[in-house]
C-alpha cells in the first residue's frame, strides 16, 4: 500500500539528478558534541541516500594521518608502561604496536580509559565516573564546569551505593584523544573500596569536609543551577549508607534491575542447551574438508544416503506442552537388549542381519588402525545397538557409530 501511494505522489522523481535527498537528509546528533555557540552538532553524512547508488566515494572517511600517528605514538608509550608492570594487555605474542584499528582510542579493547561517557539520566547504572587525583573531591567540586578537562581525567569505577554521576558540563566538549592520553592517563588500577567500610558510617576525613565547605561557600556566590547540582552530589553522599536500608527510596528502575539479577542467579544451574541425545542434523559438506572415513560404506551423517531419513536416527520423542508424546516411537531407548537378536549382534559380519552392510576385514584398518593390532583383532569384543533394525543408518541416540566395547 505504502509503495503504491509513494509512486502516485512522486510520479516523475529522477533519483540520479535530484537534489532532494541531499538537502533534506536525516540529521543525527550525539548528546554532547556542540558548536562554539553551544548548539548540538549535526552529522549530515549519515542516513543519506547517494545520488548515484554505485558511487561509494562520498562514504569514505578522509584519512587523518596526523591523528593516526598520534595514536600510534601513544600506543607504543603505554605498552612500554605495561611492560614495566609485567602486564601484557595483549595476549598475542605477535602483537604489532604500529597496527591501529579503525576508530581506535589507542588501546586494545578492554583496556585503558573508557571514552563512551553516558548522559546524566543514566546515573542508575552500576558504574560512576570519579576522578583519580589525590584531591579528588576538591577537583570534582571546583572544576565541574571546566570544559578543558581531558576525558582521561575521569575513569569508570564500580559504584559503592552512591548515585553520583558527572555533571554534563564536566564532560569535555571536543578533545583529540591522542594528545590527552599521553599527558593524563594514569596507568595505576584504582583499588575498589570495600563494602564493609561503606556500610559503617564513619566521621568524614578533615580534607573532605574542608573541600565540601569550600564548595558550599563557592556555591553561595554562584548561580542557582550550580548549587542545585552540588546539593545533588551532597545528597548522594548522605544516601550512601541509607540506600541499603531503605529500598523503597530507590527508584523503580533499580528495583527491576536487582530483580532481574536475582532471577538470573536462580536460573544459573539449569541447562538451556540441547542434551547430547537430541537429534544431530546431518553435517553439511564443507568444501576443502577431508571426508569422514567411510565406516559402514555409508556414513551415518551422509545426507546422500537413501536410508538417511528412514526414522531411526530421529531423537527421542519430544514432549508437547501438555507433557504428552507427540508421536510414539516404538524403538525409543534400547540400551542393548542382550537377548534380542535384532539389537544385539556379536558377529561383525552383518550380511546375515542386514543392519549395516559392512566389511569386517577392513574394519580395524579404517577405524582402529592406531589402537589394535590387525593380526590380533577379535570381533567378539564389539557389540552393536541399533534403534530400528530395518534401517541402514545407526541410531543417533548413541552417537555417529553405534560401536561400544563389550567389556
UniProtKB/Swiss-Prot annotation:
Residues 33-44, 247-258 have a biased composition (Basic and acidic residues). Residues 209-231 have a biased composition (Low complexity). Residues 7-32, 138-147, 184-201 have a biased composition (Polar residues). It comes from the Viruses. Residues 122-137 have a biased composition (Acidic residues). Residues 1-64, 110-276, 314-341 are annotated as: Disordered. Residues 232-246, 259-270, 316-341 have a biased composition (Basic residues). This is Uncharacterized protein L645. It comes from Acanthamoeba polyphaga mimivirus. The lineage of its organism: Viruses, Varidnaviria, Bamfordvirae, Nucleocytoviricota, Megaviricetes.
Amino acid at each position: 500500500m505504502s509503495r503504491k501511494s509513494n509512486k502516485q505522489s512522486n510520479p516523475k522523481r529522477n533519483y540520479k539528478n535530484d537534489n532532494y535527498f541531499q538537502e533534506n537528509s536525516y540529521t543525527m546528533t550525539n548528546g554532547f558534541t556542540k558548536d562554539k555557540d553551544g548548539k548540538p552538532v549535526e552529522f549530515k553524512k549519515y542516513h543519506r541516500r547517494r545520488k548515484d547508488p554505485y558511487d561509494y566515494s562520498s562514504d569514505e572517511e578522509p584519512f587523518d594521518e596526523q591523528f593516526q600517528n598520534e595514536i600510534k605514538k601513544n600506543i607504543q608509550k603505554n605498552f612500554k608502561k605495561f611492560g614495566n608492570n609485567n602486564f601484557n594487555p595483549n595476549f598475542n605474542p605477535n602483537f604489532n604496536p604500529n597496527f591501529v584499528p579503525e576508530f581506535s582510542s589507542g588501546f586494545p579493547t578492554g583496556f585503558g580509559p573508557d571514552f563512551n561517557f553516558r548522559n546524566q539520566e543514566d546515573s542508575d547504572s552500576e558504574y560512576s565516573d570519579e576522578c583519580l587525583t589525590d584531591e579528588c573531591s576538591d577537583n570534582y567540586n571546583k572544576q565541574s564546569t571546566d570544559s578543558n578537562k581531558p576525558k582521561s581525567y575521569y575513569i569508570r569505577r564500580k559504584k559503592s551505593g552512591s548515585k553520583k554521576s558527572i555533571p554534563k558540563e564536566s564532560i569535555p566538549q571536543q578533545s583529540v584523544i591522542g594528545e590527552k592520553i599521553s599527558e593524563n592517563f594514569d596507568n595505576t588500577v584504582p583499588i575498589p573500596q570495600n563494602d564493609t567500610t561503606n556500610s559503617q558510617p564513619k566521621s568524614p576525613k578533615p580534607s573532605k569536609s574542608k573541600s565540601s565547605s569550600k564548595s558550599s561557600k563557592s556555591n553561595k556566590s554562584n548561580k542557582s543551577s550550580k548549587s542545585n547540582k552540588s546539593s545533588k552530589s551532597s545528597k548522594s553522599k548522605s544516601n550512601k549508607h541509607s540506600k541499603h536500608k531503605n529500598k523503597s527510596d530507590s527508584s523503580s528502575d533499580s528495583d527491576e534491575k536487582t530483580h532481574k539479577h536475582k532471577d538470573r542467579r536462580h536460573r544459573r544451574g539449569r541447562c538451556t542447551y540441547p542434551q547430547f541425545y537430541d537429534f544431530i542434523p546431518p553435517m553439511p559438506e564443507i568444501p576443502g574438508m577431508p571426508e569422514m572415513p567411510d565406516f559402514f560404506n555409508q556414513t551415518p551423517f551422509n545426507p546422500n544416503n537413501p536410508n538417511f531419513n528412514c526414522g531411526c536416527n530421529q531423537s527421542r520423542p519430544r514432549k508437547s506442552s501438555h507433557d504428552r508424546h507427540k508421536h510414539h516411537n516404538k524403538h525409543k531407548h534400547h540400551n542393548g537388549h542382550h537377548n534380542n537378536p535384532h539389537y544385539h549382534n556379536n558377529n561383525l559380519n552383518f550380511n546375515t542381519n542386514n543392519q549395516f552392510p559392512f566389511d569386517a576385514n577392513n574394519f580395524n584398518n579404517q577405524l582402529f588402525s592406531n589402537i589394535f593390532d590387525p593380526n590380533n583383532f577379535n570381533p567378539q569384543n564389539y557389540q552393536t545397538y541399533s534403534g530400528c533394525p530395518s534401517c541402514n543408518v545407526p541410531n543417533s541416540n548413541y552417537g555417529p557409530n553405534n560401536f561400544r566395547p563389550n567389556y
